[in-house]
């Protein structure tokens, strides 16, 4: 399932572009349209990834050993760090999609698709061989250490190629997308060290981080 995650990202990216186009076409404020698009993405994934984002940031924000960080992550509610992260990350996504919606460029919808798909490629990187689970149970145990590095690279190549068509500056899209994936890999490495391994929440964090960085970066090409 993880190996095919980018296919889900492509489907969700197309759906997001359609929602953004449809809502702005009927006259909705582009920033409200961006917010609705982000909400539709969260609804389409049952909020799993945004929940993982909040839990991971709460875990990173606490003191103590990995066991304590995992306890905070699994406490069942979003703490102040998690709430702030949701506000910042989802807010940046919404505003970025709003900016893309009003861009007078044929590349704007490709940028939405690339942003969403990039998050799923980041998940494949996060599950690459050598990254172990933080617990023998849970979703992380099912997917950690499961993907060869070449699988993530294979998905990265078409994504980066597509990103060249996501802005009017052909070089900017690949630079933004590759940078977002690299930052995600480094952040996952830190999370694995901080939490004592990979879990499902970290995947949500990696995904939302990459979507946010890519969407924000691609607005620079407008």
Language model feature labels by segment:
Residues 1-46, 50, 57-70, 75-222:
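Hydrophobic alpha-helical transmembrane segments
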